[in-house]
Amino acid sequence: DVYKRQILRMPREEATKYISEAEYDSLPWAWEKAGDPRWEVELIRRMAYGEGDLSVIAKGTLAMMEKFGLPKSWLDRNDGATNSNLMYNGFPNHHGPAEAWQVGMLYNLVYNRDCMIHEIVCETGSGAPYEVTKKVMEDFFGEGCYDKAKAYTPINENKAKLAAYCVNDKNFHDSATLCNWMWPMTQSPSKERAYHGDLDLQADFMTAVTGETYTQAGLQEAGERITQMLRAMTAISFQKNCGSANLRQEHDAICDWVFDKEPDFKAFEEGTTKLDRADMEKAKDLFYDIFGWDKTTGVPTRETLEKFDLGDMADDLEARGIYDQTPAGETAAQ
């Protein structure tokens, strides 16, 4: 949407470098000038049906850049202003590693757009002292999961588990139409509760609304099933549109500026939010292990998909040759 708006705000002679004159002139500009919501509906319709040059935006950042003649390296720029994409097929940074260390980078890897995960920034931005929030987070998610601002530590398993929790919980929130900016209720303003919230509240909420019994563990499982479906669909999409279903190499590649910014600092020195390349590869290994994804390709294994009653998706991945991209011996050796 950001790129669409930038093009359409350009003067006609500039915009028609990216879309044809006929397409530009066919747009219902009277609706746009009048603030008529049909303007947005028409733009969305054209993108959904692949009509015109502008519709490439719906295919993601990589396809858009290819069409407009921009190399992938354009997103490696460390200019601090016009480039903030964390991944090459992602969206300008919104709640990533600058606020949530490796956890923020990991959960961004799952999506093709703004991941809209606020589970960490709601804690870092709560106004509570660091030591108070750290105690709450570590009691819920394990020692070492929560870093101080601009004082990051190397990846550990609890950070990877927290990232996976955030992804699954966000996918549940999307399905339940709950606001991820408010839920889950991780912290409490109550001193008597030692500022601990109640992660079970959303399960209680679901139970009250539906009349069926829900638990937090059950919601995590339901959210992870969605995560696995999304990941399998992403592999199919990348195979069809990018010619490769190796998600680790293509989809989960991180732009250089994340590691190269603030050159006066090294990663893990106090005063910077930059990440370390080798550390993030280790983080991916831990993250993939938690989700049951092949470490070489980042694709859910057949065993993982069948665990979530998604054997039909595993059959589809196999039929498309997506599982064939990793030699059996290499997978077993891992």
Residue ranges and their predicted role:
Residues D1-Q334:
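Extended C-terminal regions of large enzymes
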